[in-house]
Amino acid sequence: MAHKKAGGSSRNGRDSAGRRLGIKKYGGESVIAGNIIARQRGNKWWPGEGVGEGKDHTIYAVADGHVSFKKGFKGRTFISVLPAAEAAE
């Protein structure tokens, strides 16, 4: 005879790995063309000047310069890359 009653298996205990989303380069940081500035799901941040947006909404630099964050209309935050000479002013 069994000395313990059969225990059911739990349906919990699984979790997916984090997706490593968020800002990768902060305001004022230097970037070169192709650097990823932000990874996101949907548009938490919007692309401004000097940046491109990938099909997964990743924002990346298309020119060398410094990262800039600006608040825009409807409360949107725009990420831009300013050329190095312009960012120094």
Curated annotation (Swiss-Prot):
Gene3D superfamilies linked: 2.40.50.100
Gene Ontology cellular component list: cytosolic large ribosomal subunit
Pfam families: Ribosomal_L27
Region named Disordered: 1-20
Segments traversing the membrane: none
HAMAP family associated with the record: Ribosomal_bL27
Family: Belongs to the bacterial ribosomal protein bL27 family.
Protein name according to UniProt: Large ribosomal subunit protein bL27
Name of the gene encoding the protein in the UniProt record: rpmA
